[in-house]
Amino acid sequence: MAAERLIGFDVGTTAVKAAVFDKSGAVEARFVEDYPTQRRGIALVEQDPEDWVRLIKKALRIFDGNKIAAIGLCSQVNTHIFVDADGNALCPAIVWKDRRASDEAASLDAQVTSKQKEAWWGVPMPIDSSHAIARMAWVAKNQPDIWSKTRWVMLPKDYCMLKLTGKASTDPLSNIGLVDSNLNYIPEVLALVPGAAQRMAPLIAITEIAGSIKQGAMKGTPIVSGTMDAWAGLVGTGGAKDQSTIYLSGTSEILGISSQKVVPTAGAIVFPKTHGIQVHAAPTQNGGDAKLWFSQVSGITMNDMSDMVKETKRGSATPLFLPQLEGERAPHWNPNLRGAFLGVSRQTGLPDLARAVYEGVAFSACQALNTIKKSADVNSDIISCGGGGFRSVTWTQIRANILNTNIRTLISGEPGVLGAVILAAIGTGIHSDFETAHTALAKYSDDYYPDAKEADVYSSIFEIYKDAINANADLSKRLIELNEFEEIQ
């Protein structure tokens, strides 16, 4: 049993999370440590890649007393590091929330028809400001010295893998938008930016051993390639089973459905099928980050915010919150959307605003979920949920009411960490397939059931939410243009 312990790492948006699991799913040790994000302007969001590597090595030293069979790794994606031939980052990592490449994205997207997108990706997925090809276009244009020195354009887990093993590789799923249904790079996409194809790392399977730790703590321990945190988290929460619905809540909200059927739907993402699993996904731009923002501007702790919402009922003083603080991904894919409180009255107090934040995030998740229900042609009667946003009983119940669906929550660790462990278990033969591994390793809490009366009220408010998002789109764009002009002056 000792030789069958596994470590899962999740290099997330705000922290490195890790855990040691035994074969039965018992968590023997955990590690979580935050790192900073820099915002040097209204569109720039950056991180230091060395923070990720430093914290992974720190966790490995802490876990070093265990006998580890293998390590699995997942990470945030659409965060890009431009790396030289010696394996060193040439500049800060451009985080997925960064919008500097919005103009390049719009220009590239205009060059591709919806028919081409469906042929490449199965759905008319847009090229947005977080797309790798848009980022490469921006760097090539604005930082030609960095572009000329770039050997690899890497994702966080792949950069960490390079530093730990000395080998450059990546996986197909993490490169959504660059690969086709056969899990190969799409030459026509890479050709949109001259030199892009030569800067992509070799593709290997998500369960393939990418290399072994070359020095330091746990030297010689194999590391499985792994994949993006969203896909790992969706599988870790139960997405390996066909027609299952998954909801991950972290910095942002990610909705997913496993389905072999594809109905091309604007706003949805369909990951290439791997190991027989085909996931439809709708990642939003804001989730737990909206709660963090409100905590910071209001001066109340996030724990106090949760207690405040628990003691507050929805009523006439509760406004509607649009959580698009830094644009929106699914289903709108609009970097210019901004947040708002609507319906604030003289009776509205801080607790009402806090409740509105919880509800607004859930409304955005509801709209995202409806998009992939259509894409996957699936309507589940239960949603398996995981991530930090589901630690709040009150917020979980609000979500159940707004989604009007039963919810069960994962209690066996962070979804991404568990997903990475599942990949390591399959890669080393400890478990034979995803469903077997998930059954052995995952544990759930009791279900949350929607309150029929609350669900009915929220259904009416959701219709207003959708109209408000549409009405706010032009206003947001006009405000951004004005603010950018004023900042330049």
Regions found by a protein language model. Name each.
Residues A119-G122, A140-Q143, L162-K167, P187-L192, ...:
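A short helix-loop
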Residues M1-C91, K149, A217-S225, L403-I407, ...:
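N-terminal glycine/serine-rich phosphate-binding loop of ATP-dependent small-molecule kinases
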Residues I56, R61-I133:
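Active-site phosphate-binding/coordination module
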